[in-house]
Curated annotation (Swiss-Prot):
Active site, UniProt feature: K91, S165, S189
Catalytic activity: urea-1-carboxylate + H2O + 3 H(+) = 2 NH4(+) + 2 CO2
Lineage, uppermost ranks: Bacteria, Pseudomonadati, Pseudomonadota, Gammaproteobacteria, Pseudomonadales
Cysteines engaged in disulfide bonds, as pairs: none
Role played: Hydrolyzes allophanate to NH(3) and CO(2). Can also use malonamate, but with much lower efficiency.
Organism: Pseudomonas sp. (strain ADP)
Pathway: Xenobiotic degradation; atrazine degradation
Reported regulation of activity: Inhibited, in a time-dependent manner, by phenyl phosphorodiamidate, which forms a covalently modified Ser-189.
Protein name: Allophanate hydrolase
Length: 605
């Protein structure tokens, strides 16, 4: 489930149930919310979830609070901590001091004494790594099922895969537990789960983030990645995480420009694979949503340039069918030789296939890749950015387990070449199928164009919302966007609470499919309650208001049960804070979902 209803015992104060992105955490802390209470409540909520395969291990609460206290002391001394009090998840192939690093394999587990380089940079900025997240074993997979720790599932429909290999990291963000997580992305392991859970997945240029403290999958290609709800959050985290590491031979020096946002010209060229080279494996709705994304980018001033996808596809095939699979064996060779029984059967077969490779195969692969990179140059001479589906389709867990190699390979159709060709990429939401499953696209740029493509991805996600009110194409700085659905709508009884707090109406839009709306019993004034229901048909009308950060915490703290603030997904795939209802309150409420909104229901009375 993507959206959490507020906990009944915690309504009335700002808790993790109200906090979904960096802005909401920062607004709450600025308004006086105690960060220790937020972290403690977060642990309580994880405990309530019970046996959830998101997490492999958790940092003890006492350790998290001690880390927070240290950050508070540094903050009180005037140190700038841009991520103060922000909890995050860490994929369990990245070291967190004191927690076992398993890489999804109990027989591999070891406990490091120090954080990975990137984790340490985030901790230095005040963030709190609360635990290690589930993954496809040794980051070998794009589906999330290759793990002995239970299978994380798509938050929109638990019958479907979450995507991988950064499965737990994606689900931890998508279900609202943490505002961001670290994943990794060698073949698409950060982008695929982002698409399947309606998130942003930022895959930086190789070497922009240090790999020190990362269990290698393919060391020459590995990238630590960021999963978040918004492009702004992904960039904010990336700017902290990025940095040259002299102890990592694959770390690269890059100027601040690599993560600097770019104002795109009114006219630009974007490349898409020629129609005959596109593949959706029978998923007609994914194909339609990609075509819609192309039209949207044209509305934004882009000129669509079709290109020959052949060299990119052939490069992608080298990742597992070529000598680069030997890098996976190099990372765990002694374990694979001495204790092959501890490996997941599918992962074992993939990694041990490297034993068939020779040194000659390796050099032939290097030569072949160089030829393909040269062949791709003619495409890059014509385009400013590439637009691809993040994944051609999505599969059920049952289907993936029945055909794990072929279906997993299908998922990487548009992702596997990116690191081999030294490119940057960011995956963003791009709408929903009629069954409520999300679809995503990826913007791909040259090396160190991370900030530029992120800017375009952000504009893409916000485009539909901007059309709702052309005068406000993006939220003003120092505001938090909040979706209202009932008594806070324009001309409704509680709208004054927004206007008196300095709120400004930005747009009228609709939620993504899969929300139910109920008229609450004995509510004064009359108001509805909305919650996520994957069986609900249609969408719900909402207004988006921009509320000053200074007033956000106070506004939230006055919301009475059974309502609270959680994450709401809009019809364009973007996320905002918005009103959600505790599930128990609908037991005596009237289902008014079929009206499509509160105003339509009132008009019918």
């Amino acid at each position: 489930m993507n959206d959490r209803a507020p906990h009944p015992e915690r309504s009335g104060r700002v808790t993790p149930d109200h906090l979904t992105d960096l802005a909401s955490y920062q607004a709450a802390y600025a308004a006086g919310t105690d960060a220790a209470d937020v972290i403690s409540d977060l642990y309580a909520r994880i405990k309530e979830d019970g046996e959830n395969p998101i997490w492999i291990s958790l940092l003890p609460l006492e350790s998290a609070l001690a880390m927070l206290a240290d950050a508070q002391q540094r903050k009180d001394k005037g140190e700038a901590l841009p991520l103060f009090g922000i909890p995050f998840g860490v994929k369990d192939n990245i070291d967190v001091a004191g927690l076992p690093t398993t890489a999804g394999c109990t027989g591999f587990a070891r406990t490091p004494r120090q954080h990975a380089f990137v984790v340490q940079r985030l901790v230095d900025a005040g963030a709190i790594p609360i635990g290690k997240t589930n993954l496809d074993q040794f980051a070998t997979g794009l589906n999330g099922t290759r793990t002995p720790f239970g299978i994380p599932r798509c938050v929109f429909n638990e019958n479907y895969v979450s995507g991988g290999s950064s499965s737990g990291s994606a689900v931890a963000v998508a279900n609202g537990t943490v505002p961001f997580s670290l994943g990794t992305d060698t073949a698409g392991s950060g982008r695929i789960p982002a698409a399947f859970n309606n998130l942003v997945g930022l895959k930086p240029t190789k070497g922009l983030f240090s790999g020190s403290g990362l269990v290698p999958a393919a060391r020459s290609l590995d990238c630590i990645s960021v999963l978040a709800h918004t492009v702004d959050d992904a960039l904010a985290v990336a700017r902290v995480a990025a940095g040259y590491d002299a102890d990592d031979a694959f770390s690269r020096k890059a100027g601040a420009a690599a993560l600097t946002e770019k104002s795109w010209p009114r006219r630009f060229n974007f490349g898409v694979p020629a129609a005959e080279h596109r593949q959706f494996f029978g998923d007609a709705e994914a194909e339609a949503l990609f075509n819609k994304a192309v039209r949207k980018l044209e509305e934004m001033g882009g000129t669509c340039i079709s290109f020959d996808y052949t060299p990119f596809r052939q490069a992608a095939e080298l990742l597992y069918a070529g000598p680069w699979v030997a890098e996976r064996l190099a990372a765990i060779e002694s374990l694979a030789d001495e204790h092959p029984e501890v490996l997941h059967p599918v992962v074992r077969d993939i990694i041990l296939s490297a034993k068939r490779m020779s040194a000659v195969d390796t050099f032939n692969g290097i030569y072949r890749l160089a030829d393909l990179v040269r062949a791709a140059e003619s495409t890059w001479e014509k385009i400013d950015v590439m637009l691809l589906p993040t994944a051609p389709t999505i599969y059920t867990v049952e289907d993936m387990l029945a055909d794990p190699v072929r279906l997993n390979s299908n998922l990487g159709f548009y992702t596997n070449f990116v690191n081999l060709m030294d490119l940057s990429a960011i995956a963003v939401p791009a709408g929903f199928r009629t069954n409520g499953l999300p679809f995503g696209v990826t913007f791909i740029g040259r090396a160190f164009e991370d900030g530029a493509i992120a800017s375009l991805g952000k504009a893409f996600v916000e485009h539909d919302l901007a059309k709702g009110n052309a005068a406000t194409a993006a939220p003003p700085k120092d505001t938090v966007a909040i979706a209202v659905v009932g008594a806070h709508l324009s001309d409704q009884p509680l709208n004054h609470q927004l206007t008196e707090s300095g709120g400004k109406l930005r747009a009228t839009t609709r939620t993504a499919p899969g929300y139910a709306l109920y008229a609450l019993r004995d509510a004064t004034p009359a108001k509805p309650g909305m919650l996520r229901d994957q069986n609900a048909v249609g969408s719900i009308e909402v207004e988006i208001w921009d509320l000053p950060v200074a007033g956000f915490g106070a506004f939230v703290s006055e919301i009475p049960a059974p309502l609270g603030i959680g994450t709401i997904t809009l019809e364009d795939g973007s996320h905002v804070k918005g009103f959600l209802c505790e599930p128990h309150a609908i037991e005596t409420a009237l289902d008014i979902t079929h009206y499509g909104g509160w105003r339509a229901y009132l008009a019918a009375q």
